[in-house]
């Protein structure tokens, strides 16, 4: 609700960070959890948008307990789901700006003047990531359908034998 949204947004930066860190920690798959999972944004978005728009994670040293916890997120992902694939979905700054204007979000966070910086930060986080399985999808000149097809094709090399067997069983059904 709008009331709940305002309550969250009115929290101190420290409390917003604590809540978001808990949310990220909660959604990281644990070892042996089995099954498939999709994690969108997770700690990457938070590392980028937190300092830029929500006034947290600014000027924290790597040995700060908050950063030590946050820096362990990828180790947790690797421990719980070592086959995870990190996907960087990107588009040109102009394409993103046009899409934001053509289809505005009710509570748009990203500001048009920040797009180039945000793209650069996501690229930095992608390159720095410990996750070994990586894929880049550039949607600049592609429709949603074309981008999904590129994603499916790009994920192919990362499928485990079990994944391939499950896909085959769905095709036969």
Where are these regions (language model features)?
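Small/polar loops that bind or transfer phosphate-bearing groups
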Residues: 7, 40, 88-89, 139
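Short, solvent-exposed loop/turn segments at secondary-structure junctions
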Residues: 43-46, 92-94, 141-144
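NTP-dependent small-molecule kinase module
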Residues: 101-173
